[in-house]
């Protein structure tokens, strides 16, 4: 999500380079997810531990992945800051131990809340979140409430230095309504196309809204992606990145590995069957930035900007064949202006609510 906004800001203000602080967003992301978990535990405290929703909550108390809806809710609530205003820390770049500690503490808190009287839970939850906040400060630092930033021109010459709050910085340099200006589309052949789906707890902020997914044939999704790229607008894109990935070359191609010949067997499941059996699903979010079209305007290859560093893949990017796109692309977030009216009209439907453990739900890393 931040990479999409970064590209817009660099282009709009002709900046030599720019990065938002992922650490700042991560701080509030983890704090809000902690609140989401604790409140969900309070809401389900009358259900037995064996209840599938309760079980799922304790299995997934927190994670550092997520969806575009989480990014949009967080940014609209807390704003953004430049990377220099809240730099990365060791823990923000190596989140495993921090996430483990937070998960352990949240599970402990969850059990405590389930054993309390209902009238006591709200006050105790605030105390618990204070402890979570302290852990986050130790790991990630204190989020700035005000900072100075110097805007430079394309040659690196200072233009102006001003003070901002995270919200005023976002309002001035981005200013979009992220919660209403974008549409999430998905390709899930295991479900009916033309329908809108919602997944329980598919958000990062308790008082936010679950994201709505419009399920579409892959060709309709490609049409919107191509229109956006032609207008120089990058998109949030998610896929099953581990399948047929050549990390060294930075390619995603179903021809990268020939497992059938190697093991003398066949792998016959199609995309629908892989989703149904949990063999494939959306696992990683990147930024879709380019497409290679043939003479007839049909896509041959696609390029995404990844978050694994410039030394990973092809200059920090991955290139996928169109065949791989068909098989392992799952979600795309598109600005409304690139979405045909007949697809926008689908949002008027009553969405189908899916449980949190549905095969299509996986917090994207």
Task: For every predicted segment, state its role.
Residues 75, 275-309:
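Catalytic nucleophile-His microenvironment captured as a short glycine-rich beta-strand/loop
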Residues 210-283:
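Long, positively charged binding patches that form subdomain-scale interaction surfaces
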Residues 1-235, 302-305, 312-315, 322, ...:
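Active-site nucleophile-adjacent alpha helix/oxyanion-hole segment immediately C-terminal to the catalytic cysteine
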Residues 294-365:
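Conserved catalytic-core surface of thiol
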Residues 33, 243-248, 254-255, 295-296, ...:
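Flexible loop/turn segments at secondary-structure boundaries
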Residues 21, 165, 201, 242, ...:
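Alpha-helix initiation/capping motif
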């Amino acid at each position: 999500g931040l990479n999409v906004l970064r590209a817009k800001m660099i282009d709009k203000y002709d900046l030599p380079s720019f990065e938002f602080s992922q650490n700042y967003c991560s701080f509030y992301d983890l704090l809000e997810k902690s609140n989401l978990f604790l409140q969900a535990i309070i809401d389900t405290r009358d259900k037995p531990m064996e209840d599938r929703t309760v079980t799922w909550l304790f299995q997934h108390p927190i994670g550092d992945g997520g969806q575009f809806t989480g990014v949009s809710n967080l940014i609209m609530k807390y704003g953004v800051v430049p990377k220099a205003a809240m730099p990365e820390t060791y823990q923000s770049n190596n989140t495993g131990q921090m996430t483990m500690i937070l998960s352990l503490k949240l599970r402990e808190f969850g059990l405590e809340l389930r054993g309390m009287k209902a009238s006591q839970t709200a006050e105790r939850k605030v105390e618990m979140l204070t402890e979570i906040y302290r852990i986050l400060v130790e790991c990630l630092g204190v989020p700035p409430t005000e900072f100075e930033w110097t805007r430079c021109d394309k040659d690196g010459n200072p233009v102006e230095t001003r003070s901002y709050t995270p919200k005023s910085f976002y309002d001035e340099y981005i200013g979009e309504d992220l919660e209403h200006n974008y549409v999430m589309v998905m390709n899930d052949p295991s479900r009916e196309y033309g329908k809108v789906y919602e997944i329980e707890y598919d958000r990062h902020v308790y008082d936010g809204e679950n994201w709505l997914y419009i399920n579409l044939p892959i060709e309709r999704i490609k049409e919107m992606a191509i229109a956006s790229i032609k207008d120089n607008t990058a998109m949030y894109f998610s896929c099953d990145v581990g399948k047929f990935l050549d990390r060294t070359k930075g390619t995603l191609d179903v021809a990268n590995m020939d497992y059938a010949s190697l093991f003398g067997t066949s792998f016959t499941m199609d995309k629908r069957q892989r989703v149904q059996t949990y063999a494939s699903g959306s696992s990683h979010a990147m930024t879709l930035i380019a497409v290679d079209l043939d003479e007839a305007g049909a896509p041959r290859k696609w390029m995404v900007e990844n978050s694994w560093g410039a030394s990973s893949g092809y200059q920090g990017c991955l290139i996928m064949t169109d065949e791989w796109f068909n098989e392992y692309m799952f979600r795309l977030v598109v600005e409304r202006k690139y979405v045909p009216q007949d697809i926008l009209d689908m949002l008027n439907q009553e969405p189908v609510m899916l449980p949190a453990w549905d095969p299509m739900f996986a917090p994207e890393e």
